[in-house]
Amino acid sequence: MKLCGFEVGLNQPLFLIAGPCVIESLQLQLDTAGVLKEITSKLGLNFIFKSSFDKANRTSGSSFRGPGLEEGLKVLEAVKTQIGVPVLTDVHEYTPIDEVATVVDVLQTPAFLVRQTDFIRNVCAVGKPVNIKKGQFLSPWDMKPVVEKAKSTGNSQILVCERGASFGYNNLVSDMRSLAVMRETGCPVVFDATHSVQLPGAQGGRSGGQREFVPVLARAAVAVGISGLFAETHPDPPNALSDGPNAWPLRTMAMLLETLVELDAVTKKRGFLEQD
């Protein structure tokens, strides 16, 4: 499958989707995107910048949600033109999808909306590549009918993204078998290494996270074999306005990615026995 001008798949090198969880300011987005572009260019890693203009599913109604559609799209367009990288953002049921699609290169559907049939079809019908996040409440096998809904629109540029599964209250676990199962959808599989370490609602009015396990799960996923890695990053995670506890520090992103690129090459060198 071709995505933003490059090929993706298990027979292709790993690609990266990364950026701050939410748009905090134009300068933060430009600075972060610039650093990520420099890192990925040195590693020969294809890169898509991501950030959200509206976080509609915050734990608390008083939490920062983002700058909104109009300002958010201006920021994403600035990143795209000034830094020279493709951009991704998520949309919601109330979002004017066509308007967003005029700016971004990839659309993303939130995990909580994965079972909303009309929403999935409406997003995919626009014709842009779509990253569909698997709900925390969904088995990997249940992504197959979701993809069938998506592709019924005629859009074949569909990614499926694993972001952990609910495990009791306020906790997520990552079953690495799901990455192999989700390949059966016929879509490139992306692993979200940062939301997978989230502790939903674990800090009362906001979610917690265990960012120390981001490299652990990222290495495991790459060793299993994935097409892409999704990772939210921030220059100052403790002061990030959304999902700081599970954001990976920008200053150590290069070190993490160096390891993952090397591991990806080894993993894909001889193919996958489970597919024989």
Curated annotation (Swiss-Prot):
Please give the Gene Ontology molecular function terms for this protein: 3-deoxy-8-phosphooctulonate synthase activity
Protein name, per record: 2-dehydro-3-deoxyphosphooctonate aldolase
Gene source species: Xylella fastidiosa (strain Temecula1 / ATCC 700964)
Chain's gene name: kdsA
State the family named in the UniProt similarity comment for this chain: Belongs to the KdsA family.
Q: What class of enzyme is it?
A: transferase
The pathway where this protein functions is:
Carbohydrate biosynthesis; 3-deoxy-D-manno-octulosonate biosynthesis; 3-deoxy-D-manno-octulosonate from D-ribulose 5-phosphate: step 2/3; Bacterial outer membrane biogenesis; lipopolysaccharide biosynthesis
Q: Does the keyword Transit peptide apply?
A: no
Superkingdom as given in the UniProt entry: Bacteria
SUPFAM superfamilies linked to this entry: Aldolase
Q: Name one Pfam family in it.
A: DAHP_synth_1
Note whether Cytoplasm occurs among the keywords. Answer: yes
List the EC numbers from the record.
Answer: 2.5.1.55
Reaction(s) this enzyme catalyzes, per UniProt: D-arabinose 5-phosphate + phosphoenolpyruvate + H2O = 3-deoxy-alpha-D-manno-2-octulosonate-8-phosphate + phosphate
**Where, subcellularly, is it found?**
Cytoplasm
Question: Coiled-coil regions in this chain?
Answer: none
Query: Which UniProt keywords are present, listed alphabetically?
Result: Cytoplasm, Lipopolysaccharide biosynthesis, Transferase
Gene Ontology BP terms: keto-3-deoxy-D-manno-octulosonic acid biosynthetic process
Query: GO cellular component terms?
Result: cytoplasm
Q: Which InterPro entries match?
A: Aldolase_TIM, DAHP1/KDSA, KDO8P_synthase
